[in-house]
């Protein structure tokens, strides 16, 4: 018996980290996917060719395998499985690889066991896995990997799908990743030491996100770049940027981008840039030292 499922990666446009503190965020599914295939086996094996992982144990653990192990504990019986993961995105890139993996694995397990859950239940169960593994996580990543398209997550944790023209966007990523759990914990520690200041920062991120949402609903992309720059300044204040991420952000702007910012947890990973009329120039500039691509978005979530 064999079953498969795939889920898209994501780019957070506005609101990362603030979303952990019940602030809204906007994210879009990108056309890079994680596909998981599970099949009967005499013992449990996990193979992830893109990461060079071949792992055999009843309880996979360590790094990205923690998400697989927790999914099996919660949503599978004790029978052994052969699990193969095909990833079109680098792990730890800030593009939601762990969420896409978790959603795809839950989808594959549901099909394997003949279960039929709706997207809301799937997203909630995937979010539980991320919380268990990371200690804290917003529901945004798992929501976008489940639903696809564009998602606005409001302050009440309600998912609102919407349509909008995002204009020309570029994503670039580093060769090293930031550890999401460590970055989230770092922001939490700064919040503990400076609660009033950090509270105001999160409130301002909320205002930026809601302004972007209103403009996107009007299909007005003109202010997106400036709003990204404002959001980036606040991410820097949270302590999640690095020297090289900042270099990427400014290289994109110097090449003509209207705005650019970290996308994801930071500490490594990726940036996103709004590049009206200058996508090729920005991609060329960023590719001199990093890896960049035009952002192609996916309307499809879990399939």
Swiss-Prot record:
Disulfide partners: none
GO molecular function, one term: mevalonate kinase activity
Pathway as given in its UniProt record: Isoprenoid biosynthesis; isopentenyl diphosphate biosynthesis via mevalonate pathway; isopentenyl diphosphate from (R)-mevalonate: step 1/3
InterPro entries recorded: GHMP_kinase_C_dom (IPR013750), GHMP_kinase_C_sf (IPR036554), GHMP_kinase_N_dom (IPR006204), GHMP_knse_ATP-bd_CS (IPR006203), Mev_gal_kin (IPR006205), Mevalonate_kinase_arc (IPR022937), Ribosomal_Su5_D2-typ_SF (IPR020568), Ribsml_uS5_D2-typ_fold_subgr (IPR014721)
Main location: cytoplasm
GO biological process: isopentenyl diphosphate biosynthetic process, mevalonate pathway
Annotated positions binding ATP: 90-100
Enzyme type, top EC level: transferase
Protein keywords: ATP-binding, Cytoplasm, Isoprene biosynthesis, Kinase, Lipid biosynthesis, Lipid metabolism, Magnesium, Nucleotide-binding, Transferase
DNA damage in keyword set: no
EC assignment: 2.7.1.36
Cofactor (UniProt): Mg(2+)
Catalytic activity field: (R)-mevalonate + ATP = (R)-5-phosphomevalonate + ADP + H(+)
Active site: 141 (proton acceptor)
Family annotation (PROSITE patterns): GHMP_KINASES_ATP (PS00627)
Any GO CC annotation of this UniProt entry: cytosol
Keyword check for Nucleotidyltransferase: no
NCBIfam families in alphabetical order: mevalon_kin
SUBUNIT field: Homodimer.
Role, per record: Catalyzes the phosphorylation of (R)-mevalonate (MVA) to (R)-mevalonate 5-phosphate (MVAP). Functions in the mevalonate (MVA) pathway leading to isopentenyl diphosphate (IPP), a key precursor for the biosynthesis of isoprenoid compounds such as archaeal membrane lipids.
Similarity-based family: Belongs to the GHMP kinase family. Mevalonate kinase subfamily.
Record's protein name: Mevalonate kinase
Organism of provenance: Methanothermobacter thermautotrophicus (strain ATCC 29096 / DSM 1053 / JCM 10044 / NBRC 100330 / Delta H)
Gene (name only): mvk
């Amino acid at each position: 018996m064999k079953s498969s499922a795939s889920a898209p990666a994501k780019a957070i446009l506005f609101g990362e980290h603030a979303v952990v503190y019940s602030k809204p965020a906007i994210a879009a599914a990108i056309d890079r996917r994680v596909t998981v295939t599970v099949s009967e086996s005499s013992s449990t094996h996990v193979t992830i060719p893109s990461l060079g992982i071949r792992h055999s144990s009843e309880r996979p653990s360590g790094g990205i395998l923690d998400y697989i192990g927790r999914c099996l504990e919660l949503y599978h019986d004790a029978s052994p499985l052969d699990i193969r993961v095909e990833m079109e995105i680098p792990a730890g890139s800030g593009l939601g690889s762990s969420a896409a993996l978790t959603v795809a694995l839950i989808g594959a397990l549901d099909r394997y066991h003949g279960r039929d859950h709706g997207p809301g239940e799937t997203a909630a169960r995937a979010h539980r896995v991320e919380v268990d593994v990371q200690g804290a996580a917003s529901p945004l990543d798992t929501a976008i990997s489940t639903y696809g398209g564009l998602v606005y997550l409001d302050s009440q944790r309600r998912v609102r799908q919407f349509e909008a023209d995002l204009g020309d966007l570029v994503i670039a990523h580093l060769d090293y990743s930031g550890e999401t759990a460590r970055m989230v914990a770092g922001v939490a520690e700064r919040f503990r030491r400076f609660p009033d200041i950090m509270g105001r920062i999160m409130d301002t991120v909320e205002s930026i996100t809601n302004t972007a949402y209103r403009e996107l609903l009007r299909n007005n992309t003109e202010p997106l770049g400036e709003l990204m720059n404002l959001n980036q300044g606040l991410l820097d204040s949270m302590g999640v940027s690095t020297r090289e991420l900042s270099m990427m952000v400014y290289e994109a702007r110097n090449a003509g981008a209207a705005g650019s910012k970290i996308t994801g947890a930071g500490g490594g990973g990726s940036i996103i840039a709004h590049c009206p009329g200058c996508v090729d120039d920005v991609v060329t500039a960023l590719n001199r030292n990093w890896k960049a691509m035009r952002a192609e978005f996916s309307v499809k979530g879990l399939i």
